[in-house]
Amino acid sequence: MLNIGPFSFHSRLLLGTGKFPDFDVQQKAIDVSEAEVLTFAVRRMDIFDAKQPNLLEKLDVKKYTLLPNTAGAKNAEEAVRIAKLAKASGLCDMIKVEVIGDDRTLLPDPVETLKASEMLLEEGFIVLPYTSDDVVLARKLQELGVHAIMPGASPIGSGLGIVNPLNLSFIIEQATVPVIVDAGVGSPADAAFAMELGADGVLLNTAVSGAKDPIKMAQAMKLSIEAGRLGFEAGRIARKRCATASSPLEGMSVVE
């Protein structure tokens, strides 16, 4: 089970809802992924305008936990305002904090992310900050009391996969809250690798919505995350410089 604050989920795949070709493909991809948590940008959806078609009216909201994010925020104050807007619309208190500090790389602003997380915790939100693979920043966020850490594998939408597995493994090793790898995942192999490192979950969007067949890719991501988790729990063999025979030598007949 993936436990985040008071919530428990069977699926370790969290799925973003942007950039799908249409609502039908989006819904089918969500269905086959078996994701229970769906994230969306509050700023890109007019949740108060009933005339505008949006994700909330297309989905069975009782079946999913909707995770609004603060994408578009440039500072802590903007992030807090967006979070409060989501809460006022009737969504749950869980929020993904996203404060971008660089328009080219879309990397998060560490100072504003810390500040926003602290402010939202004081407001009683369940806080999941998107951060870089900075080990020290992850620890400081954890010390604030956030409910999960969401380090990026690589820049948002890049599909580069896990570019710094060493830092990611350090974050996972020191974590006392769930670590959900977020951003940059491009393939099922990337998702499986994140889980093999010990991540508690993976959040992805473009890897599915931008695939040639988003529905098949959603299923592939589901299976790879399950396989990666099983592999982590099973424990891989140690890496060695020299070969070790896979067949036992004891009891073998000697042919002369």
From Swiss-Prot:
The keyword Transferase applies. Its EC number is 2.8.1.10. InterPro entries: Aldolase_TIM, Thiazole_synthase_ThiG, ThiG. It catalyses: [ThiS sulfur-carrier protein]-C-terminal-Gly-aminoethanethioate + 2-iminoacetate + 1-deoxy-D-xylulose 5-phosphate = [ThiS sulfur-carrier protein]-C-terminal Gly-Gly + 2-[(2R,5Z)-2-carboxy-4-methylthiazol-5(2H)-ylidene]ethyl phosphate + 2 H2O + H(+). It comes from the Bacteria. The active site is at K96. Pathway: Cofactor biosynthesis; thiamine diphosphate biosynthesis. Belongs to the ThiG family. This is Thiazole synthase.
